C-alpha cells in the first residue's frame, strides 16, 4: 500500500512539471523571425529590427582586431552600391572570438569610420554563441540555411541574408567575402523580388 501511495504522490508532483515542460517546449519551438527583435544600436538607442522589413538585410558579426576585419571595406562597398535599392547591412560587434573586439562602442565606431568609412548600421556589442548568445543570434543559428546550415557561429564575419519577406535565405561562412559571387547572387536575386 505504501508503494502505491508513494507512486501516486510522485505522479501528482511530477505531472504538473511535465505539463509545464510541454507548454514551455511548445513555446520555445516557436521560431521568431530575425526582424522581430529590438537591438541596441552602437549609440545605445533601441532599434526595432522590424524597420528593415521589406528590405534585403545582410547581418554580420564583426570585430576590429581580426584577420577578416578588412571585410568591412567590402561591406561598405555593398552598402554604397545597393543601399538605394533597399539593401541594409547590419554589423554586430562581438568579442567572443579571441577577444578581437575589446573596444567600447565609441572606439568601435571611431575605428570603423576612420579605417573603413563605415556608414551602414552598426549595433552594440553582442554575444553570438553559447548560452549567452542574444536571441537574434539564437534564432539565426537555429535555422537550416544554405550553404552553411544550422549551428553555432564559427568566427567573426559570418553572414546571414534575409529576404524582403523577413525570412533568412542564406548563410555564408566567415571566409566567404561579402563581394563573393555567391553572396552577390543571393542579394541581387532578393533585391529583384517585389515587396
Annotate the PLM regions.
Residues 21-50, 70, 135:
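N-terminal "domain-start" segment that seeds a small globular fold
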Residues 55-56, 65, 69-93, 113-116:
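Conserved helix-turn-beta segment immediately C-terminal to the redox Cys motif
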Residues 86-103, 119-130:
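Thiol-based oxidoreductase modules, predominantly thioredoxin-like and allied folds used
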Residues 5-13:
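Sec-dependent N-terminal signal peptides
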Residues 41, 61-65:
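Amphipathic alpha-helical repeat scaffolds
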Residues 135-138, 142-195:
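Thiol-/selenol-based redox modules, centered on thioredoxin-like
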Residues 16-17:
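C-terminal motif of bacterial Sec signal peptides marking the signal peptidase cleavage site
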Residues 106-156:
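Short, internal strand/loop/helix patches
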Amino acid at each position: 500500500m505504501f508503494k502505491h501511495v508513494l507512486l501516486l504522490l510522485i505522479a501528482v508532483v511530477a505531472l504538473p512539471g511535465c505539463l509545464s515542460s510541454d507548454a514551455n517546449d511548445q513555446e520555445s519551438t516557436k521560431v521568431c523571425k530575425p526582424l522581430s527583435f529590438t537591438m541596441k544600436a552602437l549609440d545605445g538607442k533601441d532599434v526595432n529590427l522590424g524597420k528593415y522589413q521589406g528590405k534585403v538585410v545582410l547581418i554580420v558579426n564583426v570585430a576590429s582586431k581580426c584577420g577578416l576585419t578588412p571585410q568591412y571595406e567590402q561591406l561598405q562597398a555593398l552598402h554604397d552600391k545597393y543601399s538605394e535599392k533597399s539593401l541594409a547591412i547590419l554589423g554586430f560587434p562581438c568579442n567572443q572570438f579571441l577577444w578581437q573586439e575589446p573596444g567600447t562602442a565609441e572606439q568601435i565606431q571611431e575605428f570603423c569610420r576612420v579605417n573603413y568609412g563605415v556608414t551602414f548600421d552598426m549595433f552594440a556589442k553582442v554575444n553570438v554563441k553559447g548560452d549567452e548568445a542574444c536571441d537574434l543570434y539564437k534564432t539565426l543559428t537555429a535555422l537550416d540555411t544554405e550553404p552553411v546550415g544550422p549551428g553555432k557561429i564559427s568566427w567573426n564575419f559570418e553572414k546571414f541574408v534575409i529576404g524582403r519577406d523577413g525570412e533568412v535565405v542564406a548563410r555564408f561562412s566567415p571566409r566567404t567575402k561579402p563581394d563573393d559571387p555567391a553572396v552577390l547572387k543571393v542579394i541581387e536575386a532578393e533585391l529583384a523580388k517585389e515587396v
